[in-house]
Swiss-Prot record:
Domain of life: Bacteria
Source lineage: Bacteria, Pseudomonadati, Thermodesulfobacteriota, Desulfovibrionia, Desulfovibrionales
One GO MF term: asparaginyl-tRNA synthase (glutamine-hydrolyzing) activity
Family designation: Belongs to the GatC family.
Broad EC category: ligase
UniProt-recorded name of the protein: Aspartyl/glutamyl-tRNA(Asn/Gln) amidotransferase subunit C
Alphabetical list of InterPro entries matching this protein: Asp/Glu-ADT_sf_sub_c, GatC
SUPFAM superfamilies: Glu-tRNAGln amidotransferase C subunit (SSF141000)
Assembly behavior: Heterotrimer of A, B and C subunits.
PANTHER family associated with the record: GLUTAMYL-TRNA(GLN) AMIDOTRANSFERASE SUBUNIT C, MITOCHONDRIAL
Function: Allows the formation of correctly charged Asn-tRNA(Asn) or Gln-tRNA(Gln) through the transamidation of misacylated Asp-tRNA(Asn) or Glu-tRNA(Gln) in organisms which lack either or both of asparaginyl-tRNA or glutaminyl-tRNA synthetases. The reaction takes place in the presence of glutamine and ATP through an activated phospho-Asp-tRNA(Asn) or phospho-Glu-tRNA(Gln).
Reactions it catalyzes: L-glutamyl-tRNA(Gln) + L-glutamine + ATP + H2O = L-glutaminyl-tRNA(Gln) + L-glutamate + ADP + phosphate + H(+); L-aspartyl-tRNA(Asn) + L-glutamine + ATP + H2O = L-asparaginyl-tRNA(Asn) + L-glutamate + ADP + phosphate + 2 H(+)
């Protein structure tokens, strides 16, 4: 089922994209190509293929969960451009 311009406009709206009509046509064509490729991938026989979650075979060692000495509040706040002594002061955005 080909993707229509209306479908592409709906997806663009959901993604908060503003697209012109000519770009919507191109977007619809690209989405159609992606979905066609997904159908091709879905038709591949993978019955005898073992699932592969990562091509890397090494294991990630776990570190010991022990408390370590952390920086003090004063050391951390020393790097901030503005503080009130206990907290970072940041500019108001809204």
């Amino acid at each position: 089922m080909p993707i229509s311009s209306e479908d592409a406009a709906k997806v663009a709206k959901l993604a908060r994209l503003r697209l012109d009509d000519d770009k919507l046509e191109r977007f619809a064509g690209q989405m159609d190509g992606i979905l066609a490729y997904m159908e091709t991938l879905g038709s591949v026989d993978t019955a005898g293929v073992e699932p592969l979650y990562s091509p890397v075979t090494h294991e990630t060692p776990m570190r010991a969960d022990v408390a370590a000495k952390a920086c003090s509040r004063d050391q951390i706040l020393a790097n901030a451009p503005a503080t009130d002594g206990q907290f970072f002061i940041v500019p108001k955005i809204v």
